[in-house]
Structures are given as C-alpha cells and as structure tokens.
C-alpha cells in the first residue's frame, strides 16, 4: 500500500466565462455564463443562491492572469490538471476555442490538461427557464472521414 500512486484529480473546465460573438447574437450583448449564475434562485430552505464567486470574482477567461491564478488555486487544492470542454461541431466549426488555443500557443498556464469533446447540438431550451423552445443554435454534425481527420489533427 505504501507505493501506491495517488489518483489524478482532473477538474472540468467550462470555457464560457467570457463574452463571445455567438452568445451576443443568441442572448444579447455581453452574455456569459456569469449571467446565468447571477439568475440562480434558491429552491429550498437553506439553499443560498446565487453563489457569488469567491477568490477570483466574476473573472474573464480571456485574461491570461486569470487562467494562471486558476491553475495556482487548482494546484493548492490538489487538482492534477484541467479537462477543457472542447466544442467542435463538425466541418471545422468550433466555438469557445480561443482560450485553449492561447493556452497551447503560449504554454501558459504551465498546468497539465486534456480536452473533453462536448459533442452535442446546442438548443435554446437548454437556457430557457421553462425548458421550451427547440430552436437549434448550432448543430453537431459528423462530416465524414476528412472532417474526422481534420478534428484529430486539431487536437
């Protein structure tokens, strides 16, 4: 038992905490996941909502210093690496790739990571309070062998 390795702790990393063009078009200028966080309502006694972010506040992931601080906090908490959600909708169409592209290009933060492919169609009902509205925002497509190769080469 003394030579057993510790398990890797990987934190999922949602890259939607910054404005981007498509969210502005679909939900209004300046919409980010922070908009949804701020709308949270308590559902039962003792359920404190909305949760106000602690250490880094309402951060913007476009700022390299924020990503560095996140990596430092993760290390302090015993996290081994991040799993960045990766949005490849087929035929070369991506969303939210700027953050991971910058991490790869700069090597910062210097923190282990992997990608998790969030391969699903985005529909408006995912964000509508009542779950209504099947409006497709962006469709997940599987474009065949050339597209698969292109995606593989990207990652």
Stretches with model-predicted labels:
Residues 1-155:
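Glycan-processing catalytic domains of CAZymes
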